[in-house]
Curated annotation (Swiss-Prot):
Its EC number is 3.1.1.29. InterPro entries: Pept_tRNA_hydro, Pept_tRNA_hydro_CS, Pept_tRNA_hydro_sf. Monomer. The keyword Manganese does not apply. TRNA binds at Y14, F64, N66, N113. Signal peptide: none annotated. It comes from Fusobacterium nucleatum subsp. nucleatum (strain ATCC 25586 / DSM 15643 / BCRC 10681 / CIP 101130 / JCM 8532 / KCTC 2640 / LMG 13131 / VPI 4355). Its main location: cytoplasm. Hydrolyzes ribosome-free peptidyl-tRNAs (with 1 or more amino acids incorporated), which drop off the ribosome during protein synthesis, or as a result of ribosome stalling. It is found in: Cytoplasm. GO terms for cellular component: cytoplasm. Keywords: Cytoplasm, Hydrolase, RNA-binding, tRNA-binding. This is Peptidyl-tRNA hydrolase.
Amino acid sequence: MKVVIGLGNPGKKYEKTRHNIGFIAVDNLRKKFNISDEREKFQALVSEKNIDGEKVIFFKPQTFMNLSGNSVIEIINFYKLDPKKDIIVIYDDMDLSFGDIRIREKGSSGGHNGIKSIISHIGEEFIRIKCGIGAKERDAVEHVLGEFNQTEQKDLDEILEKINNCVIEMLSVQNLDRIMQKYNKKKEISK
């Protein structure tokens, strides 16, 4: 079993913000796999699909970003998951250029409060896909809680497709090093 976790904040107010790229990516994956049902469980919105013979749960914590770990630990404990190999967390990263993604097997929170919350519950060893939202000269909170601008919006579909492909490979291929080599590059978005 795998759990694909997208981080974000619940509610209409936040749904199109940069900070919600994890929710947006999970919703895009659900669309790709034709999953329409979503239910509340583990303080999250949860949907599932059997993909290549393995149960995959798509998971969006509804605790608000800073408390994401409270939700994540519930599903890990319920299914007795090994965070090192059974979960993939997708979230925004201001330190990466917009459109870049980085896959990591472990590490610190990098100042991301959602990741900090998860680490406080399960430790630093879990697979994560960091999605670059760029750093702006303005206030960090204003930037992450701001909506994608027109230029970013034009590239968003292509970025989400890259994230889709990355997650699909992670679900079917066991060689994470090869996947990291392929995707941990500067963005290659067509203009």
